[in-house]
UniProtKB/Swiss-Prot annotation:
One of its GO terms (cellular component) is host cell membrane. This is Putative uncharacterized 4.5 kDa protein in genes IX-XX intergenic region. It is a single-pass membrane protein. Keywords: Host membrane, Membrane, Transmembrane, Transmembrane helix. It comes from the Viruses. It comes from Enterobacteria phage PRD1 (Bacteriophage PRD1). It is found in: Host membrane. The keyword Membrane applies. The chain crosses the membrane at residues 10-30.
Amino acid sequence: MTENIISWNVANWVTVILMALAGYAVLALAAKVINNRAQEPA
């Protein structure tokens, strides 16, 4: 029983970390695109 809880906890943390990294990557890419568009002469 304890092993199941631990393994589920680890899987849960991995999922949360991956989601956080994915969200951060999307925000970083969006910031780059916005910066590139802002630097272009209108």
